Amino acid sequence: MKYREIILNIPKEIAEDFTTFLDEIGVAGYYEILFDREVPRAPHEEIISDDTKFRVYLAQEDNENETKILIYLKANAGEVFFSESRWIETKEYEEAYKEFYKPFIVGSYRVIPTWEKDTALGTTPEGIFPLFINPGLAFGTGHHETTRLVLGRMGNLSLSGKKVVDVGTGSGILSVAAAKSGASPILAVDVDPNSVRSASFNRDENDISSEVLAVEEGGFDHEKIQGQTWDLLIANITFAVLKANIQKIVSIKTDHFLFSGVITERLEEFLELLKNEVGGEGVFFQEDTGWELIEWKRKG
């Protein structure tokens, strides 16, 4: 089977809305390329570019979505975007992201692609947890600012023996990190079946049992999420999805939340939403190139 690969350079400020749009029209897959270096950007470093690069994949029989994408970008980015496209085979589609995915350290973790497991493991510093990840077509390489923000904060939390739920798990990287830090049991859920398969694969690659880390299809209204009590809820999900699910979030039995996926322009609106609907207060905040991490505690 062939796929249409569209390579896009678009303004960073429309990236969140663009990913929401791609989800709505139902493309075969996409990912955002941010950087591919070993050492994360230091806080004092300047942002290299105001643009971000996407690779979007369309199934061979999909004759409409490329036009929809270009119309969307014309309307929202004007002339400030670049695109090119080509036909690729299934193997290229599944392997394309490997070109941009290298081992790197964030906080207490070193994210290692599964195909570099044997060579990179021996060079992992002592005291750093290795996370073996093959993102496939699921979100969560660890390169995205939102994922790095959560990983960085998780390394400063005491997770041993804690009961954790990860909503919108993507590749499962955050759940794997929680397990490596001693959390158990963990429930990772995602509405995308590809993500469920990817997260399950990565769990197994890290020799984590299904008793410690269960991966299931679902969202905030998942029966197990709503029916149990949790020490920590992790949600690396866009503001639009968080806002749409706020009442489901309110009903989850936990007093401790880690949210990411919120852009700086929406931060105040999101904090007001949490204050009015969830209650409690923010206890830790961090920003990375226009993306926000919010650690929130509800008063028990």
From Swiss-Prot:
GO terms for cellular component: cytoplasm. It catalyses: L-lysyl-[protein] + 3 S-adenosyl-L-methionine = N(6),N(6),N(6)-trimethyl-L-lysyl-[protein] + 3 S-adenosyl-L-homocysteine + 3 H(+). SUPFAM superfamilies: S-adenosyl-L-methionine-dependent methyltransferases. It comes from the Bacteria. Its main location: cytoplasm. CDD domains: AdoMet_MTases. It is found in: Cytoplasm. GO terms for biological process: methylation. Its EC number is 2.1.1.-. The keyword Metal-binding does not apply. Pfam families: PrmA (PF06325). One of its GO terms (molecular function) is protein-lysine N-methyltransferase activity. Keywords: Cytoplasm, Methyltransferase, S-adenosyl-L-methionine, Transferase. S-adenosyl-L-methionine binds at residues 147, 168, 190, 236. Belongs to the methyltransferase superfamily. PrmA family. Methylates ribosomal protein L11. This is Ribosomal protein L11 methyltransferase. It comes from Leptospira borgpetersenii serovar Hardjo-bovis (strain JB197). The lineage of its organism: Bacteria, Pseudomonadati, Spirochaetota, Spirochaetia, Leptospirales. The gene is prmA.
